[in-house]
Amino acid sequence: MENWNKYIPEGMKDILFKESNIKLNIEDQLRKIYKYSGFSEIISPTIEFYDVFNSNIQAIPQEKMYKLFDNLGRILVLRPDMTTPIGRITGTKMKDCTYPLKLCYTANIFRVNEKLNGKRGEITQSGIEIIGTNGIKSDVDSIVTAINALLSVGLKNFKIELGEAGFFQALTENMEIKEENLKKLKEIIRNKNYVALKKFLDEISSKYSKEDFELIKNLPKLFGDIKIIEKAKALTKNKKALKSLDDIHNIYKSIENIGLEAYISIDLGMVQNIDYYTGVIFKGYVEEVGDSILSGGRYDNLIQHFGIELPATGFAINVDDIMIALKKQNTMSMDKDKKVLIFYKEEFLRKAYDFMQELKMKKIICELSLLDDDKEILLYSKKKGIDFIIGFMGEEKLFVKDLKSDKIAFLKKDEIENLLML
């Protein structure tokens, strides 16, 4: 049997040093945005019962879930998303809370992906859920928070595309079409394949109205700015479809009033395989990443599976894809705190330790040297990105070497602190 002890499974990744630091900074920045927007963070178990995710509206197919068994033979899964566990927590532990609930999270989720497709099996998601209100104010709050979250990490040139789940449902609810053909139709529209769509509709056009036929035929073309809404309205008299278009229009206008409309576009061809979303849906895109970096929308039917009927909306950001985009845009933010290495003679350990603690309290990254040789200390410091080397060697003033300028000085402790705070 082959020994795999030096490898990791497909889709997994070790994240080291600089990359890890950048990722944690992104996560911290997103948490700040949520916190100062009134959201409370929650943490759910990595392992859940399979039954939590086994419903007819589950957004993640069961074949995409990592499954295992407990000692009683019950099926468990590594959580494939965070929204469903939050629905479980809300339905079972938050019935007496004050609504609307504003919850946030940053956690790893796990999905089985085909080999060699380049997708991760472990993904860091960061997002919010607004639970207990079904007005467009909460939809706007969710979308605006998403925009501010992406801006906060330094992302440039992104777009949030708005759609409406009820729009496509309204156009197709009276169609006599098999489930497999409906899935095929959705896929064609999502891929904006005009030729395949015309061929597909020509084969079944006699089964629904000419008006609906024309609108569905044009769905792949109905994307762009707010003018698309009026264009779509001119193609239908379907009351439910018109209501969906009005909802998108009103949400857009609210975002426009805030001044963030530059980040918004409309895509009426945004459809889903499973009837998970019930209202506005949105996805975030950036040129540097092929897939969406953010997805969200209204899902009013999920939490009722856990014992309480509550409307909800929210979004999830793919932190790993954000890192890819920031790297390509050359806008990754590194930790800018100064780094100090203190070396010392053994009899001055206590003084060196106390000074290190003082610097840490001032948010300066500081460590005591584990090396004694001068050359080794210098080499270590350069490779580690240390800014200053400080030496406790018995003199009244301390040895200080600035590794950026290569200058050496002998300074008192308060002078060193002033230097490091510049």
From Swiss-Prot:
A Gene Ontology cellular component where this protein is annotated is: cytoplasm
Predominant localisation class: cytoplasm
Question: Which residues are the signal sequence here?
Answer: none
Protein name per UniProt: ATP phosphoribosyltransferase regulatory subunit
Per UniProt, subcellular location reads as: Cytoplasm
Give me any GO biological process, just one: L-histidine biosynthetic process
State any single GO MF term.
Answer: transferase activity
Q: What else is known?
A: This function is generally fulfilled by the C-terminal part of HisG, which is missing in some bacteria such as this one.
Keywords from the named record: Amino-acid biosynthesis, Cytoplasm, Histidine biosynthesis
Q: Which organism is it from?
A: Clostridium botulinum (strain Kyoto / Type A2)
Q: Which domain of life does this protein belong to?
A: Bacteria
Gene transcribed to yield this protein: hisZ
Task: Please state the pathway this protein functions in, per its UniProt record.
Answer: Amino-acid biosynthesis; L-histidine biosynthesis; L-histidine from 5-phospho-alpha-D-ribose 1-diphosphate: step 1/9
The protein's matches in CDD domains, at most eight in alphabetical order, are given as:
HisRS-like_core (cd00773)
Statement: the UniProt record of this protein carries the keyword Amino-acid biosynthesis: yes
